[in-house]
């Protein structure tokens, strides 16, 4: 018999690094979730841009169950068919020639930064170790990636941090140019800063970074953990900009909810990662890669990408209508189905309160700092789910504006 659990048990048993919602989801289907008491939610959070095809997608369940009936794990002393097939799909769909599989976005970024340092050390010398990243970025929670992230809130308690990492202002090419030099081994950037406020890069900014990296023989790393796998209306966001990175990291939506990450790069750069230089026990396991292969099959189609663009327009239209009613947002921005509503000054710092009110109204949303409400729904969210979910979101906005909101 299963142990009966409640939300209070989290506070009793778990390390307190999270403050979860007061309800526990127990079942999902498409873009809907149900909690223990049966209340329904429209899910516009998507597991933080992970559940690209919603909950319990039948094709993903079939892929997982089929592989689970064969074998689950062997370790990196052996390869497996699903991993090889997924690698080929990623290579065929992108600039990449080589793939490294891991379990998360942080691990993918860790691998990318290690590769960049090793490539520079092997080809130039150990003095070429500098990494340029951007303020308010987010690249993961390992010591290396949290240091690259440029958000002191996440890193200040863990000093001393890895050296030779400097941070420029995002979307400011002059700021980046002042830091990138011949001692720089890599520049790591998000095409859309997610945690930093859902801020798309300008084309001129990314093109300028590409030129600076070429000039100084530094590798350009695109962190597409949040923007990748169809989220922006292209398979990867770099395709919007006409700027090709040297290394791309991907995770989140790649597994559709099953943990997987990947680092993509070229043969030349990959060649320095010789046997033993890096590794992972679970990365590229057959369960994860079988599911991810099916995710890619479904998402990497013109129909799906066109659908993302159409759903983007539907969200923008309805969010603008909500804003006409309540005047809460100074800007609605983003690409595809990664959207951010920036709060007006009078509502500054209340993004979390809005998210809490939205949950009470039956819709799950995210935040990106204290001043931005973030949406990252399933890419196949239906018109009805968009309409119903945003009606519920409008109710939350009304409650906040009229003073009916509470912090409970």
UniProtKB/Swiss-Prot annotation:
InterPro entries: Ac/SucOrn_transaminase_bac, AcOrn/SuccOrn_fam, Aminotrans_3, Aminotrans_3_PPA_site, Class-III_PLP-dep_AT, PyrdxlP-dep_Trfase, PyrdxlP-dep_Trfase_major, PyrdxlP-dep_Trfase_small. Signal peptide: none annotated. Its EC number is 2.6.1.81. One of its GO terms (molecular function) is succinylornithine transaminase activity. Gene3D superfamilies: Aspartate Aminotransferase, domain 1, Type I PLP-dependent aspartate aminotransferase-like (Major domain). This is Succinylornithine transaminase. It comes from the Bacteria. GO terms for biological process: alpha-amino acid biosynthetic process; arginine catabolic process to glutamate; arginine catabolic process to succinate; ornithine catabolic process. The modification N6-(pyridoxal phosphate)lysine is found at residue 252. Belongs to the class-III pyridoxal-phosphate-dependent aminotransferase family. AstC subfamily. Coiled coil: none annotated. Its cofactor is pyridoxal 5'-phosphate. It holds the Pfam family Aminotran_3. It catalyses: N(2)-succinyl-L-ornithine + 2-oxoglutarate = N-succinyl-L-glutamate 5-semialdehyde + L-glutamate. Keywords: Aminotransferase, Arginine metabolism, Pyridoxal phosphate, Transferase. Pathway: Amino-acid degradation; L-arginine degradation via AST pathway; L-glutamate and succinate from L-arginine: step 3/5. PANTHER family: AMINOTRANSFERASE CLASS III, SUCCINYLORNITHINE TRANSAMINASE. Catalyzes the transamination of N(2)-succinylornithine and alpha-ketoglutarate into N(2)-succinylglutamate semialdehyde and glutamate. Can also act as an acetylornithine aminotransferase.
């Amino acid at each position: 018999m299963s142990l009966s659990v409640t939300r209070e048990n989290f506070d009793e048993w778990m390390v307190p690094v999270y403050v979860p919602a007061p309800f526990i989801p127990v079942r999902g289907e498409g873009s809907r979730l149900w909690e223990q008491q049966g209340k329904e939610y429209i899910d516009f959070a998507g597991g933080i841009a992970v559940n690209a095809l919603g909950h319990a997608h039948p094709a993903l369940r079939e892929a997982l169950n089929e592989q689970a009936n064969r074998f689950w794990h062997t370790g990196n002393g052996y390869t497996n068919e699903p991993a090889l097939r997924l690698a080929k799909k990623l290579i065929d769909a992108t600039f990449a020639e080589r793939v490294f599989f891991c379990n998360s976005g942080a691990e993918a970024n860790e691998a990318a930064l290690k590769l960049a340092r090793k490539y520079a050390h092997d080809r130039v010398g150990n003095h070429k170790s500098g990494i340029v990243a951007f303020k308010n970025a987010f690249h993961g929670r390992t010591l290396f990636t949290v240091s690259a992230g440029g958000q002191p809130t996440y890193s200040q308690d863990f000093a001393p941090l890895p050296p030779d990492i400097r941070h420029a202002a995002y979307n400011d090419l002059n700021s980046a140019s002042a830091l990138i030099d011949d001692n720089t081994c890599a520049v790591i950037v998000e095409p859309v800063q997610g945690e930093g406020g859902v801020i798309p890069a300008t084309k001129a900014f990314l093109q300028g970074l590409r030129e600076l990296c070429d000039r100084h023989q530094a590798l350009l790393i695109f962190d597409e953990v949040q923007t990748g796998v169809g989220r922006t209306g292209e398979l990867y966001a770099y395709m919007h900009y006409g700027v090709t990175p040297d290394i791309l990291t991907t995770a989140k939506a790649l597994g559709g909810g099953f943990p997987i990450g990947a680092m993509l790069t070229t043969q030349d750069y990959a060649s320095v990662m010789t046997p033993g230089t890096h590794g992972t026990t679970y990365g590229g396991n057959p369960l994860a890669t079988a599911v991810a292969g099916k995710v890619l099959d479904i998402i990497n189609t013109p129909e799906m990408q066109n659908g993302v663009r159409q759903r983007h327009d539907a969200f923008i239209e309805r969010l603008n209508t909500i804003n006409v009613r309540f005047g809460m947002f100074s800007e609605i921005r983003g690409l595809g189905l990664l959207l951010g509503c920036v709060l007006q000054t009078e509502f500054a710092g209340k993004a979390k309160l809005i998210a809490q009110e939205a949950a009470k109204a039956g819709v799950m949303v995210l935040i990106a700092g204290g001043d931005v409400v973030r949406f990252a729904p399933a890419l196949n969210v239906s018109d009805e789910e968009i309409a119903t979910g945003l009606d519920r979101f409008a109710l939350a906005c009304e409650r906040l504006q009229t003073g009916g909101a509470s912090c409970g």
